[in-house]
């Protein structure tokens, strides 16, 4: 897998992103692994009718251990800021918590995501909820998250 370490602007400084990433536009790029192509086909078979379009991109995150994480956020770049969209997330490897909370505050949901689990966020979820993969102090192995999205949704 062609993993990259990234740095991002966070308020007044640039920080290391606490996970490795790899992004692929599957309308242009070859899938990074044959399993990605198979999963995309299967997810499109199941969800493209409801979504009204196919999944065209895959973003991969590698959480190397419990110190790797993603902060609370909503996927609001592109169309998901104003339209109902769908993201299908497949987890591989160690179990990690996927947390959801209503945007603007409220009680959060904590969903353990184990090897092979599929989590689908659809409808207005990206606009009305935030999600995170919090750090954990419990010993944990690596986890890979594959996020399949339609065009112009990040």
Label for each model-derived stretch:
Residues 1-154:
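Non-heme Fe(II) oxygenase metal-center motifs and adjacent flexible, charged/small-residue loops
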């Amino acid at each position: 897998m062609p993993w990259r370490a990234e740095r991002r602007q966070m308020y007044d400084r640039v920080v290391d992103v606490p996970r490795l990433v790899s992004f692929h536009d599957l309308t242009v790029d070859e899938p990074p692994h044959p399993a990605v192509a198979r999963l995309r086909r299967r997810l499109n078979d199941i969800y493209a009718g409801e979504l009204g379009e196919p999944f065209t991109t895959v973003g991969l995150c590698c959480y190397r251990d419990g110190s790797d994480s993603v902060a609370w956020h909503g996927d609001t770049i592109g169309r998901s800021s104003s339209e109902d969209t769908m993201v299908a997330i497949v987890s591989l490897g160690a179990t990690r918590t996927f947390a959801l909370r209503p945007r603007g505050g409220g009680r959060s949901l904590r969903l353990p995501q184990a090897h092979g689990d599929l989590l689908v966020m659809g409808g207005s979820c990206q606009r009305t909820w935030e999600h995170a993969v919090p750090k954990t102090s419990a010993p944990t192995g690596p986890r890979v998250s594959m996020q399949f999205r339609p065009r112009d949704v990040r």
